[in-house]
Amino acid sequence: PRFFQLRGIGEVEQYQGAPNPSVGFLIDDIDFSGVGMPATLFDTQQIEVLRGPQGTTYGANALAGLISVRTADPGKEFELHAEASVGSYDTRSAGIAIGDGLDAGQGGWRLVAQQYLSDGFRHDAFYDMNTTNGYDEGTLRGKLHWQFNDALQADLTLMHVNINNGYDAWSIYNTYTTYSNQPGRDEQRSNGVALRLVDTIDGLGELRSVTSAADSAIVYSFDGDWGNDAFWLATTGYAPYDYFQSDNRDRRTLAEDLRLTGDPSRALFGRLRWLVGAYALRLTESDNERYAWDAFDAGPGGAAGAGSSTLDSQYGATNVALYGSLEADLGTRTSLSGGLRIERRDANYVDSADAATPFPEQTNDMVGGNLSLTHNAGNGQHLYLTLARGYKGGGFNIGSEILSEQRSFAPESLWSLESGLKHARPEDPLQLQADVFYMRRQHMQVYLSEQLQQNNPLDYVFFTQNAANGENFGLESEGSYRLGPAWQISGSGALLRTRYLGVSGVFTNLGIDGRAQPFAPGYEVSAAIEYHAPGGWFARLDSHALDSFYYYTSDAQTSRSYHLENLRLGNRHGAWTASLWVRNLFDSRYAQQGFYFGLIPPNFPNQSFLQLGDPRQVGLTVNYDLPRERP
């Protein structure tokens, strides 16, 4: 699966049902929050990252922020974009985007198809194969823009994404060689549709309706012992030792966002610009979890030998919200805006293990909003100060080991104070923006895990509890500078500090009070230099550095800081572009994820295990583009 974190807040996994994401994720208005694998990014036009709570316009799924991916829209003229790549580790991809305008200039259409394949950077010694962790990702997308008249227009998006990846990424030796006899799968087949209608109403304003739906079938499975009987017998003298877990999910969403924006030429009282809206989201998810084992020692349920168990569950959540905002000019260059969102979330959960004692339905009434002051300082410089409140709904803890008082957890709220500046003028070689922020988390939801049987790598309990408070604060900046007609440098940087505050109860023994939150690196820095010669030659060298961070709240294991470099060299000639690229130029070894638990028999000592990031990869990409006229 693909998860996101913003300013140190977000998810890193979902092993059970009852999803509850902190980062909203949209692709062409279609909600894929918590299931981000359809972001294959071919023919992408823009990725907008809204950091911090989006309590007015988006609500419960955007406590930490919102990521919105916009793919290329239809144009007025015939257009064609084709791309093919080959690379090391048997990487190859091909994609095509084609579109044209409609008769009488009333709109346009665009069709996209792309396929990406790679072996996944692992070698499974048991099968002597390089594809057990491989990638097989296909995308089909169609977009239609129709201008009915000067006032009414419609945009329709249809998409199908088929992710058929393997999952065999872990080794007890923390290397790229695995020993799994039951390699897992990381699959997602998603269909999505979005219809955006915009109507300009004379004397009132603009009415916008966005209706979207998505259906995702997800398979997530893995070899629970990361080995095979021959390997474990030779390594430890113990066998059989064989565990496997699979989770089949079917998630559906249906959403409607109806918004009326007042005509700015007819502001209320001559100075108030306004917006009102209503939002509804229905999410359902059915899960089938299966565990299988063949163990020399006690497996799930306390019996040695072979066996299996299953857990079927159903989850549903309905969000309904009303929101609005006002903006007023305080002078020729200064404006003040405020927004308010009131949202109700009803959620229910039931599973086959607790059918006799069902989970009580949970209802959360939540309020968010923002107050912002902006000032145009002239010469392309803008300043802002924002106070915002975001929120996230409560949820359920699953499993027979969960105590009755821990079966549910309450909503979390977040106050954010942010100030920043932006300097941008087309004729100016320097483009810059920077901000500082402080976020206070109240009734902070903290995700915990505990291994119940030391001799069983699958016997885990996962649960979320509300800690007292937390804080996240830092500095972010990004910018670019043109050194001349051929050279440009760019970069971004962030400093982040996070802490748990005033924890109690189940968290006391963990010693996390004052400690940093997981997946919250202290710094992140990127820098790039680009060269574009008049003859079509170009080059780009970029570097990305990341500080260490805690993997989980439940233990004190941390990653190591690292940096990666990438290089691209190429030439443009007419409609053709060819580029040679190298990712992870110096073949750095770094960890993407880490676990700390007992896996290796016979004593099963707790120890650290790492999932390594991708090694150096070299490839060639060729593009063909016909000029396009933007609408």
Q: Where is each model-derived feature located?
A:
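N-terminal periplasmic accessory domains that precede
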Residues: 3-5, 22, 26, 49, ...
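Short acidic/polar hinge/loop motifs at secondary-structure boundaries
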Residues: 14-15, 19-53
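Surface-exposed extracellular loop regions of Gram-negative outer-membrane beta-barrel proteins
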Residues: 15, 162-175, 282-286, 346-348, ...
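Transmembrane beta-barrel wall of Gram-negative outer-membrane proteins
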Residues: 79-81, 86-118, 122, 126-165, ...
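Membrane-embedded beta-barrel scaffold of Gram-negative outer-membrane proteins
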Residues: 115, 196-200, 206-224, 376, ...
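Structural signature of Gram-negative outer-membrane beta-barrels, strongest in the C-terminal barrel
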Residues: 145-151, 159, 260, 271-273, ...
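Gram-negative outer-membrane beta-barrel transporters
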Residues: 261, 275-277, 329-336, 438-440, ...
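C-terminal beta-signal and adjacent terminal beta-strands/loops
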Residues: 440, 484, 545-552, 571-631
